[in-house]
Amino acid sequence: MPKMKTHRGAAKRFKKTGTGKLKRGHAYTSHLFANKTQKQKRKLRKATLVSPGDFKRIRQLLDNLK
């Protein structure tokens, strides 16, 4: 059986933390900023963790990621 491959699209979007959780960036950060408040834009800058409901599915895509 061939080796499992890391999903390269997912690998570019998620990083593993030291404790094994997954860090991700926010959506809605590429354009249309004129109709977002300064507070919204500020909160979107900071990275956040993947929710527990999505973690298992994303972990399968990134199985071989260090």
Swiss-Prot record:
InterPro entries: Ribosomal_bL35 (IPR001706), Ribosomal_bL35-like (IPR021137), Ribosomal_bL35_CS (IPR018265), Ribosomal_bL35_sf (IPR037229). It comes from the Bacteria. GO terms for molecular function: structural constituent of ribosome. The keyword Transferase does not apply. Keywords: Ribonucleoprotein, Ribosomal protein. Residues 1-26 have a biased composition (Basic residues). GO terms for cellular component: cytosolic large ribosomal subunit. This is Large ribosomal subunit protein bL35. It comes from Geobacillus sp. (strain WCH70). The gene is rpmI. GO terms for biological process: translation. Belongs to the bacterial ribosomal protein bL35 family. Residues 1-48 are annotated as: Disordered.
